[in-house]
Regions:
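Extended, Lys/Arg-enriched charged tracts that mediate electrostatic binding to polyanionic substrates
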Residues: 136-144
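N-terminal accessory segment detector
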Residues: 1-134, 148-358, 362, 372-419
Length: 419
């Protein structure tokens, strides 16, 4: 089989990444767990788990089909081995898949969702439902691709989960019903909606830091558990299609059944961006690698926002730029598009309101952390600190004034004082 490294592609100008033709980006376990919980809260545990599994199956099917074609994996054995290798390399843990075209079983060890949930919450809480919807969908997709079956032909159910204090994660696979393919959200779909990038403030500095961080990320690999642990978090290379289907279908579901609750769901989706910036960006800013490359954070607002924009670019979130910055008053972030934009346009058409939930929440977190975290004291960015920071509400608010998904020339989010 061919070299997997050659299956990575990046739009350097726009800071968007692809693997096997599928849009990908880096996210941490705090974001992953928060988003999954938001979906379950919005839809209910049963329907939320179904959506999470189906979104994973769909996005993983596209990934694995692209990779199998790219590296020349032709037989079921080769394709199952490829799926197991890719899953671990992306930081999701290890899968042992034993299937035929009619179904089978799989066993997971150190699965990203179940393991990180146990690490974060397991000492205090026993989970009542399985946590690994993503792994379940991935196993189903791996089986479909291995045997050349159409999407939907295999269903997977997690029958045991370490987050429920079982000894291992186990999955049962059985025949399903093929589903109608949806519009592809791939390299071609992304290219079709690209907008020219525009230089922002401190552009050269942001880009220099982003390139340095990209070089560093290129040296990071999964450990023997199939996990990537760094910057105080578990990091995954993840599928943008998974995140986007969860977010936008949850909003659509609530809008149809309980429209008055849409603002609540949208606020939680924005908070997922806030959670990511607090834990992942904060962990990077406090890391020895960052200190060696950029210098330890000092609490300088301008330097903080410059660093955060560089991190966003390196992680594959898009070409985030600073259009305006007045410390203690106002921040304007812009991007030609984000990883959310192509999906919304392909699957939901033009948006009627700001749809870049992650960009909105992240922008708020940029200013919250810049103004409220004592960086010189090298704080521990724990859940307790996060709760204490936001216990009395946010000091900053976001308004998305422009959105490529609405037909505008760029995405723009304005962050101002909330109180």
């Amino acid at each position: 089989m061919g070299d997997l490294a050659k299956q990575h592609r990046r739009f350097d100008e726009h800071h968007l990444a692809f693997f096997g033709g599928a849009p990908v980006l880096y996210h941490c376990h705090h974001f992953n767990l928060f988003l999954d919980q938001t979906i379950d809260d919005a839809l209910g545990a049963e329907q939320g788990a179904r959506l999470r599994t189906e979104a994973a199956r769909e996005s993983a099917h596209a990934l694995l089909a692209g990779l199998a074609a790219g590296v020349g994996a032709e037989t079921p054995v080769e394709r199952i081995a490829l799926a197991q290798q890719v899953f671990a390399a992306m930081g999701h843990g290890h899968l042992a898949i034993d299937v035929a075209d009619g179904g089978g079983e799989a066993r997971g060890t150190y699965l990203h969702y179940g393991h990180s949930w146990s690490e974060k919450y397991g000492r205090a809480v026993k989970r009542r439902t399985p946590a690994d919807g993503f792994a379940a969908g991935f196993v189903a997709a791996a089986t479909e691709v291995a045997f050349g079956l159409p999407l939907g032909s295999v269903r997977a159910r997690e029958s045991a989960c370490v987050a429920m204090r079982d000894d291992a994660c186990r999955f049962v696979l059985e025949r399903g019903e093929p589903v109608e393919p949806r519009p592809a959200v791939d390299i071609a779909a992304t290219e079709a909606v690209l907008r020219p990038s525009e230089p922002g403030l401190h552009e050269e500095r942001i880009e220099t830091i982003a390139r340095g961080l990209l070089d560093y990320l290129g040296t990071v690999a999964a450990d023997e558990r199939g996990l990537v642990q760094g910057f105080g978090v578990f990091v995954t290379l993840h599928l943008a299609g998974y995140y986007n289907r969860l977010s936008y279908e949850a909003v659509a579901h609530v809008r149809e059944r309980a429209p008055g609750l849409v603002p609540v769901v949208e606020a939680l989706l924005r908070e997922s961006g806030q959670v990511c910036v607090f834990h992942t960006f904060g962990g990077i800013l406090l890391s020895p690698e960052w200190e060696g490359m950029v210098g330890a954070p000092t609490g300088d607002v301008e330097a903080h926002v410059i660093g955060c924009c560089a991190i966003a670019r390196a992680l594959g979130f898009g070409r985030w730029s600073i259009a305006e910055l007045e410390p203690d008053r106002r921040l304007v972030l812009r991007a030609p598009l984000t990883y959310e934009t192509p999906y919304h346009l392909a699957r939901h058409g033009q948006a009627t309101s700001g749809s870049s939930y992650f960009l909105q929440g992240a922008g708020v977190a940029f200013m919250e952390l810049a103004h409220r975290v004592p960086w010189r004291d090298e704080p521990k960015l724990s859940d307790a600190f996060y709760r204490s920071l936001f216990a009395k509400g946010q000091s900053w608010k976001a308004e998305q004034t422009l959105d490529t998904a609405k037909g505008d020339e760029r995405c723009e989010v304005v962050i101002t004082r909330a109180r």
